[in-house]
Amino acid sequence: ILSMLLIASPILFVLAVYPDSFSMSWNQGRGGFLFGLAFIVAEIIGIKFIVSRTRLIFGIPLAVATIIYFVLLDFGLHDYIINAAPAFNVQLIYSWEWFWDFLVITIFAISASILMFGKKWIRIVIAGPVFLAGSAIILSLDAFFPYDTLGPLQYFVPHLVQTNVWIINAFELGTATARDNLMFLQGDHGPFALQVFWPSAGVHSVVIYSLVMMAFLLKMNIKQNRKIMYFGLGIIGTIVINLIRIFSLSVFALKVSTNPVEFEEY
């Protein structure tokens, strides 16, 4: 329990001091911290591994140093990070800003896990750090390669768009056509164009899910065929959820409003 509290302490501190920063939007807040914490807690609870007092004591400075980082953000560090963005040709400031938070918490989670559990940390508490690291990687990609500039991830988007267009026309919700990642919608409130990029299409969630599921499945003592089946079903489920998200946005434009402000708020 003490090891779990130690690893969780920086996240709990940030949650207590900056609760408004925990937005569930993937690139506009620290909501991902909670998912990472949930994975860590789920993995540690129930294990029969005794962490020595010495390891716990050595872990305290790591937690304190991480907490200090988040405190310093209010004392000029945040502005320094934002001002440094142009020097690295960063396109999206929000993703750049949150990338550093996720990078720091990832380094802490991995370092603390190694310190607490030694070489066995990969078998004990891998999913949480993998989720946090995956989030940091995706945020960095979004910061440096925004919109459709990252070809491999953007490659899947037109297929999702075409599927969404087919569903709209099949259910006669309006008129929809597509060209690459651009949808042209004609509904009750007039025409509306919706351009979909890989982050908004949920490609990032598929990537992060894949990493986390691989971490979990490697630990599970089940047959290889079952692992492949669970992994595949999870990928399909994640894609379906992202399709539903794109579809709901399209229905809003078709049936509710084409006002850009209202659309953004939705």
Where is each model-derived feature located?
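Hydrophobic N-terminal alpha-helices or hydrophobic patches in metabolic proteins across all domains
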Residues: 1-266
